[in-house]
Amino acid sequence: MNSHVEQLKASIEPVRNTLLAHPVYSQIQDLQGLQRFSETHVFAVWDFMSLLKSLQIGLTSVALPWVPVGSADTRYLINEIVLGEESDVDEFDVRISHFELYIKAMQQMGASTTVIEALIAKLNAGLPVQEAIEAAALPKKVKDFLQFTFDISFN
């Protein structure tokens, strides 16, 4: 193998080992553990979709009239990621966002989607994102994580 690749693998090995030893893995020992994990992790999936949209708004042109903005390479990278995340494919070859696919997987395994669906419903009803997050039945750590993303995105 390429010596550069070997050096790169060696340099990230300590971080990789730290990640692999993360306590979350000990919590996922059975279906119930996976269900509990996904009921919280779905907010990280939604957060990523929102952060990605913030990057697309900030680094590409999404306004009318369209004008070129920033680096073409940056636009390509961001839009390629957006395409993949917003236009995934399910097991029936139907287009679906990665977020919606995650929700579908949660439902198939019997995990509750009540809290994330309630949050999305509040947003669809016009409640500002910070208020919708605050009103959600979520642990404080999850609320803080989400609020941090939107504080960055809006400021």
Predicted regions located by residue number:
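Active-site-proximal alpha-helical scaffolds that flank and shape metal-associated catalytic sites
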Residues: 76-155
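Short, well-ordered alpha-helical segments
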Residues: 70-76
